[in-house]
């Protein structure tokens, strides 16, 4: 089964062509990535594939769902870690995870269980009470990835999750 399929996916910003007619077929279970220099359109493609922005033209199907007809249905089934992260700086790590679960309507018991699982799985137990404002960039990235696992998703998109990390922090994040 294909989890992502595009046909002639194109994005223009005014007269500037950012993405030029991409055709993709990505199978379920496949790990896939984009390589290219700064400004090549990698982040734009991810925003198109995650329905965070509409294409100028072309077709997109994610998990069998037509993006033109049901972009919100797609958003409910995917996780997205963007290059420019968003944080609630005043929340502790565990409260940030819990709040994200609340946003996805995860019941309280499940949120508590998942928070504990994710704190352990992502090596966040020792910093669970720290506020996001007090975390290193690497710790913030781990929290950002962990919070996507608070809801049931079928597909995870990562847009440069290791940007700004030193080599040891990069390896640590990728090991999760």
Q: Regions from the language model: what does each represent?
A:
Residues 131-135:
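Conserved ABC ATPase signature
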Residues 58-66, 73-74:
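Conserved ABC transporter NBD signature motif
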Residues 98, 102, 109-127:
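Conserved ABC ATPase "signature" region
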Residues 50:
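Helix-to-loop junction immediately C-terminal to a conserved catalytic motif
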Residues 156-159:
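Catalytic Walker B motif of ABC-type/P-loop ATPase nucleotide-binding domains
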Residues 145:
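Hydrophobic anchor residue at the start of the ABC signature
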């Amino acid at each position: 089964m294909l989890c992502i399929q595009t046909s002639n996916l194109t994005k223009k910003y005014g007269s500037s062509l950012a993405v030029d007619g991409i055709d993709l077929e990505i199978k379920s279970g496949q790990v896939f990535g984009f390589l290219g220099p700064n400004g090549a359109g990698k982040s734009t493609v991810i925003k198109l594939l995650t329905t965070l922005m509409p294409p100028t033209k072309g077709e997109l199907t994610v998990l069998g769902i037509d993006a033109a007809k049901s972009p919100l249905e797609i958003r409910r089934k995917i996780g997205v870690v963007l290059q420019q992260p968003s944080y609630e700086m005043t929340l502790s790590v565990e409260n940030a995870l819990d709040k994200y679960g609340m946003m996805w309507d995860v019941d309280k018991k499940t949120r508590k269980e998942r928070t504990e699982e994710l704190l352990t799985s992502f090596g966040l137990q020792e910093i669970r009470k720290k506020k996001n404002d007090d975390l290193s960039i690497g710790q913030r990235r781990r929290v950002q990835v962990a919070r996507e696992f608070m809801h049931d998703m079928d597909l995870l998109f990562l847009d440069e999750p290791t940007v700004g990390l030193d080599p040891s922090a990069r390896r640590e994040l990728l090991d999760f």
